[in-house]
Amino acid sequence: MSNQHALLISNLLPVGSNISTWWNFGSMLLTCLMLQVLTGFFLAIHYTANINLAFSSVVHITRDVPCGWIMQNTHAIGASLFFICIYIHIARGLYYGLYLNKNVWLSGVTLLMTLMATAFFGYVLPWGQMSFWAATVITNLLTAIPYLGVAVTTWLWGGFSINDPTLTRFCALHFILPFIIISLSSIHIILLHNEGSNNPLGTNSDIDKIPFHPYHSYKDFMTTTSMIILLPISLSVSPDLLXDPEKLTKPNPXXXXXXXXXXXXXXXXYGLLRSIPNKLGGTLALLMSILILTLPPFTHTSYIRPMTFRPLSQTLFWTLIATFVMITWTATKPVEPPFITISQLTSIFYFSFFIMNPLLSWTEHKIMMQS
């Protein structure tokens, strides 16, 4: 009977034999999520959501709490690692045409929006100079909403300016949203295993499947272990590599920061926002940069699912990756020439990908049919 149970467990999740390392980022994201919830819990024990005490409580965690600096830096670096894994996970989905599994893809986009909101609320909590100005600038975008904008902003602030109620609300939201993320992640995984994982060839995996354990579980374990090893190295050698020194100074409402740089996590979306001089236009660009990811499932025109055998689409895809890196880089720079021009051009390229890709895929199909 025990042998039958072992056989049942080992064959519980049949997976295509040829899925590559790019499929490992899902398990890495789950590891990041567990790490963030765990370190966040220990930080919440010592954190005080008060504008006069928040900054001091973060300093207290770093200096006085045993291993507090490890928790604080792991949480900060872990968030950046989380988003790096997410962006690679999304890029893999775009490259291999995984968006054709519509339910999984759309639940993933919802998950991304929730994660970005959580990261923003968390960025505000230390209440340093950069946190204060990021909160002021980003929440002010809500005033661009016609008719309701000012009322919504005042409601979110809990008054007519960013103050103690704002920080308390952001703390409560940052605490509750990870539980929503866990729920959405569960839905995402359930929907994925409803149809099963795709593979790099984009073919049906039913004819050649192997048990997930031990073949793929060990592969997942290797990349997850590599990430966990990278974390303490980064923690020890350069904990502020992905952060801004302005966050280490107390907030001063009278003096604006040189350039309000968002967290490394949401820098790409912030870069798109900054590239448009109009407030409403910038806000729409920020929203559309995420919502446009819902288009590929409905605009796929190629008869071949992945870009593996489509050289023109591949070229366009790698242009998108270069564009994304450029947007992220310009978002960390001051709002002055030539960064404004670079930011505007890269923003046009970013949105153009989602329009040009279906047209190029259709052209490729026509060329292949003729040859």
UniProtKB/Swiss-Prot annotation:
Claim: Chaperone is one of the keywords in the record: no
GO process annotations (BP): mitochondrial electron transport, ubiquinol to cytochrome c
Protein name: Cytochrome b
Family label: Belongs to the cytochrome b family.
Subunit structure: The cytochrome bc1 complex contains 3 respiratory subunits (MT-CYB, CYC1 and UQCRFS1), 2 core proteins (UQCRC1 and UQCRC2) and probably 6 low-molecular weight proteins.
GO (cellular component) term, any one: mitochondrial inner membrane
Subcellular localization(s) per the UniProt record: Mitochondrion inner membrane
CDD domains: Cytochrome_b_N (cd00284)
Transmembrane feature ranges: 25-45, 69-90, 105-125, 170-190, 218-238, 280-300, 312-332, 339-358
Binding residue positions for heme b b562: 75, 174
Cofactor note: Binds 2 heme b groups non-covalently.
Lineage, broadest ranks: Eukaryota, Metazoa, Chordata, Craniata, Vertebrata
Record-linked InterPro entries: Cyt_b/b6_C, Cyt_b/b6_C_sf, Cyt_b/b6_N, Cytb/b6-like_sf, Cytochrome_b_N_euk/bac, Di-haem_cyt_TM
Residues binding a ubiquinone, per UniProt: 193
Keywords: Electron transport, Heme, Iron, Membrane, Metal-binding, Mitochondrion, Mitochondrion inner membrane, Respiratory chain, Transmembrane, Transmembrane helix, Transport, Ubiquinone
PANTHER family registered for this protein in UniProt: CYTOCHROME B
One Gene Ontology molecular-function label: ubiquinol-cytochrome-c reductase activity
SUPFAM superfamilies listed in its UniProt record: a domain/subunit of cytochrome bc1 complex (Ubiquinol-cytochrome c reductase) (SSF81648), Transmembrane di-heme cytochromes (SSF81342)
Keyword DNA-binding: no
